[in-house]
Amino acid sequence: MATIVKKQETIQDKDQVKAYLTQKGLVYESYKTPESLDLILGQKGLSDAEKEEVLSGLEYRFDQLKKQHGYKANDLVVLHDEVPGISDMLAKFDKLHIHTDEEVRYIIDGSGIFGFIIDGERFEVHVGKGDFISIPANTNHWFTLDQTMRIKAVRYFKDNSGWTPVYVDESKVLINA
């Protein structure tokens, strides 16, 4: 269940989280992951074959999203503290940036933090298992792992060409620091 953390407020109620994110132009849903995947998702790391098994177990969700939003591809990203080069990998995304394509994530294990500056306001969305978030193209955001240092997320794509981060000067988009 996602949690919103703002300057003076924390929002934890699922309906209020969804309403707040909708107001900010983000799509948020909460989906249950199939119990049949619990054992494999409980592992810290996954082989390529295990990733394919997980994606196969979630094919029904991909089929729904293809029909609703036109996604053409998906993959599974597995991040944890023992992934070689994890610090360098996270350093690409923990600074304010945009993408020229939407960024779509379905968190199926672990947790992380998406940060945003929208309409001059800074806030964080703490995501965990079952959270689905779609960030529109050109939205100021960043991502980092939380203290658990572990996340598994399905990424959905319409086109891979918009995936290079374009870094943004925070002082130009933040109204109240």
From Swiss-Prot:
GO molecular function list: acireductone dioxygenase (Ni2+-requiring) activity; acireductone dioxygenase [iron(II)-requiring] activity; iron ion binding; nickel cation binding
Record-marked site positions (Important to generate the dianion): R105
Pathway: Amino-acid biosynthesis; L-methionine biosynthesis via salvage pathway; L-methionine from S-methyl-5-thio-alpha-D-ribose 1-phosphate: step 5/6
Keyword annotations of the record: Amino-acid biosynthesis, Dioxygenase, Iron, Metal-binding, Methionine biosynthesis, Nickel, Oxidoreductase
Cofactor(s) annotated in UniProt: Fe(2+); Ni(2+)
Functional summary from the UniProt entry: Catalyzes 2 different reactions between oxygen and the acireductone 1,2-dihydroxy-3-keto-5-methylthiopentene (DHK-MTPene) depending upon the metal bound in the active site. Fe-containing acireductone dioxygenase (Fe-ARD) produces formate and 2-keto-4-methylthiobutyrate (KMTB), the alpha-ketoacid precursor of methionine in the methionine recycle pathway. Ni-containing acireductone dioxygenase (Ni-ARD) produces methylthiopropionate, carbon monoxide and formate, and does not lie on the methionine recycle pathway.
Protein name, as recorded: Acireductone dioxygenase
Organism annotation: Leptospira biflexa serovar Patoc (strain Patoc 1 / ATCC 23582 / Paris)
Lineage per the UniProt record: Bacteria, Pseudomonadati, Spirochaetota, Spirochaetia, Leptospirales
